[in-house]
Amino acid sequence: MATTPGRKNAHDYKARLVWDGNLGEGTSTYTGYGRKYRVQFDGKPDLTGSADPIFRGDANVYNPEDLFVASLSSCHLLSYLALCARSKINVIAYEDDAIGTMVLRPDGGGKFETVTLRPKVTIAKGGDAAKARDLHKRAHETCYIANSVNFPVDCEPEIASGE
C-alpha cells in the first residue's frame, strides 16, 4: 500500500498478475490453454490462482471467486476486531463460514448476487454478548470491501462466551 500523492486518505494497492497458461498455442482454442496465473505483490509471496473448475480451472488453487468472498470475510473480521478492542470486548476466537452466490447469465457473464457472512465469535467470560453482536453492524458499515460492492452482504453472527 502506498499513499496516493495529492489525495489525503487515499491509498493505492498494487498487484501484478502473470498468466502461466500458454501451453504452446496461446488461446487459439477454448480448451487449448491453461487457466493458471500468479499474483505478485512487492515483498510478499506469490499467490497462485486459476479459474473455478466449472470454467476449466484447477481445483487445487485459489480462484477469483474464492478470493472475492474471502476478501469480504477478512475485511469484516479486521473491522470487527478493531471495534471490539476499542469497545473493551475481548474476542478470544473467531471463525467465519462465508458463502457467496454468483449467478451466471445465458451469455456467459454473471455476477455475485449476495454474500453471507456467518461469523462464530467467542468472547471472554463475562463479556457483553449483546454489544459484541451489535458491533457486527458497525463493522459492516466500516468495512472497505463491503462498501465497494453493489450487492447485499449479510451477516449472521453467533456469539458465545468462553470459559
Task: Pin down the residues of each PLM region.
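Extended beta-strand/beta-hairpin segments
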Residues: 1-70, 81-163
